[in-house]
Amino acid sequence: MANYTAADVKKLREITGAGMMDCKKALEEAAGDFDKAIEILRIKGAKDVGKRAERSASEGLIAVSGNTMIEVNAETDFVAKNSEFIEFADKVAAAAAEAKANSREELEAVEVDGQKAVDALQQLSAKIGEKLELKRATTIEGDKVAVYMHHRSADLPPAVGVLVAYEGDDEGAAKAAAMQVAALKAKYLSSDEVPAETVAKEREIAEATAREEGKPEKALPNIIEGRLKGYFKDVCLLDQPSVTESKKSVKQVMDEAGVTLKGFKRFEVGQA
């Protein structure tokens, strides 16, 4: 005969967040001793977290608070849309914004519910039963920041997040720029930000390709510059054709709106 009641199981589940069968087994092992059962579940949870640490967490969500954006990972999209997981991510994002977190280490160290975020994460991992990970954080400088969050599916949390720092009064134009970054994945704001070694490499590739195609020697300089310009259109936000007005560049659209883009940050779940 069991030396515990259904009420004991319910209470233990409420306190620990463990599953019903785990609670029953813990109470049986503890011979009905409630505190001992809690200890058993805590030890089991710690062991399970250790096992989960070897698994991959490639799903998750992007959360934003103020000028700060974070990525929190889980193993499955089922957990990624779990309300408790989402609430935890929002709390961490708010704490990260207050701390202006700019790295994984700074993200793990922010305080949530009286403890470090990384410790709170481990507890949630034990409760949910999946490996969870605080992946990264970034904070963008600026008095005005436009935010765009993209959902891959209506029932899932945001998988792509973009922050765009800007000057000007047209928030809609800045938001459109953020949507552009989300969709076309610009790497740089302008061609001035592209590293010199990257530009040199692109020139080499353009020249080698043109020679392989048998282009005339005297035409090479113009061909190289044209292909370099095409590269900038691919990777530089201001040089890209606008998704809202395809005959204009993003810079032209922003200039007409009286908006100056100062910088941007883009996160996508599972991407570096």
UniProtKB/Swiss-Prot annotation:
Q: Does the keyword Nucleotide-binding apply?
A: no
Give the location in the cell. Answer: Cytoplasm
Q: Which GO terms describe its molecular function?
A: translation elongation factor activity
Write out the ranges of the annotated region (Involved in Mg(2+) ion dislocation from EF-Tu): 76-79
- List UniProt keywords, sorted A-Z: Cytoplasm, Elongation factor, Protein biosynthesis
Q: Which PROSITE patterns match?
A: EF_TS_1, EF_TS_2
For this protein, the record's InterPro entries field holds: EF-Ts_dimer_sf, Transl_elong_EFTs/EF1B, Transl_elong_EFTs/EF1B_dimer, Transl_elong_Ts_CS, UBA-like_sf
Q: Which GO terms describe its cellular component?
A: cytoplasm
The answer to whether the entry has keyword Magnesium is no
| Protein family according to the UniProt entry | Belongs to the EF-Ts family.
The protein's role, per its UniProt record: Associates with the EF-Tu.GDP complex and induces the exchange of GDP to GTP. It remains bound to the aminoacyl-tRNA.EF-Tu.GTP complex up to the GTP hydrolysis stage on the ribosome.
Q: Which PANTHER family match?
A: ELONGATION FACTOR TS, ELONGATION FACTOR TS, MITOCHONDRIAL
Could you tell me what this protein is called? Elongation factor Ts
Q: Which organism is it from?
A: Corynebacterium jeikeium (strain K411)
